[in-house]
């Protein structure tokens, strides 16, 4: 692709973005939700299955949560409009996310929003994924959404009432990196090595070369009132 074609492609995407009240741009909701999960039974080889599991995980937080992260207690109601946990996932599958969400206790609110959602945002959407989504017919605008919502180098701050509770949330995230074999199989490039910081209060997944110099973790945990000077995050939960 020539430089002129690349520039035209960028201009085409920018024209289709919506503009918020403060001038920020975001991918339209219709594009974000305009995906179709790929049936695994269409795959003929283990490599194809792995690619499809990855692709479905990028597209759908509920899929990642139930199929990859093993959240078997989430609602399995096939009527998506009545499936509570599917709808909870859809709530945060949007560009320009700034939501305050109130849900009664014991409905897996922390599981969806403080465990599954942060990991979903930290999935590694790169050139290989871009090429795959293009090859199966997704638009440049949908790929823009994927690039905006997933980043191997993302910095997420998780806040709880106390640091003790925040660390408990962190332990649930770290458990997937340390003990979820299926998650490890699908996304080996983000699994931490001995070089990455991995403590109770800061979890650094393996990053790209350009992201390794960041002081903030992929997932940093704090309690209310903790100092945040000189810290910079992409997402706060």
Spans of features found by a protein language model:
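Phosphate/NTP-binding elements of NTP-utilizing enzymes
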Residues: 2-4, 9-18, 26-237
